[in-house]
Amino acid sequence: KTLNKVGAAAGLNSGETGTLVWTVMASRGLNSVMAKESKKLTITRLVGFEEIPAQLYLTGSATEGGMDASKAVACASPEKDKFEVFTKLEGGKTYKLVDRAAEGAKVFYINGNKIMEGEGETTVEKTGVYRIEMDFSIASVTVREVSKMEFYFCPSGAATFELPYVGNGVFCGQDKIEFKQEGWGRDQRYKFLMTYADGSIQYWGTKNTTDSNPGAATPEDPYFYIMETPDNQWDQKWKLNNEFDGAADGYNPGAITKISVIFNVENYTHKVELAN
């Protein structure tokens, strides 16, 4: 992508190949000297978009919002030129990408692993929850079906209950959580585990490294922000407040905890609350 930016600065259009002449200039203070030797570099620019939409939505009969343009499903933008959405799609029905949730929007569609501009439409073979990642700078897209999201309890080294998809980019589930008694106290560390339909997995943990529980932090606090994390048992985890220890010998016997993982916001986050 760096060479792609160099090609753009040199005036090459998307997908075009050109040969550039480059050299080195050294400077110190106000003085600069250009090297006498130069080299040639041939670059083929990636097939991307010159004008990247400021926002992106999914609309169509396959989407959660249906054909109503005002109910188009908004995508998040985790990085410059990139968009992403977790959403349910109906198999055999169609959807497209638009730059605003209104009639007359600019339209894009997915063709294989490429993003195309124009009045095309896209389908998925089966109904399911999908993660769609789009990079407009190189016109590429990855579509993966999410089979499940689970609460991962670090002391057990395992997922203990599932968070079903409930719509609008949110996974939500509830169960009793029993902190694990250790010699030093009760262990309450956790993160999340996402499994894709192909069997691959992705852990989701804290975006802001922490080794404490949230205390009185509000649900909007950055403490709860989530991000993709490495495949391991202990790193980048959170800690639950004592009120969520529903074990018979815990702080709140019988407590049922409700957890929501939320992907429909700029900073992906999660919410923990008592269900009962």
Features from the language model and the residues they span:
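Insoluble glucan recognition modules
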Residues: 1-276
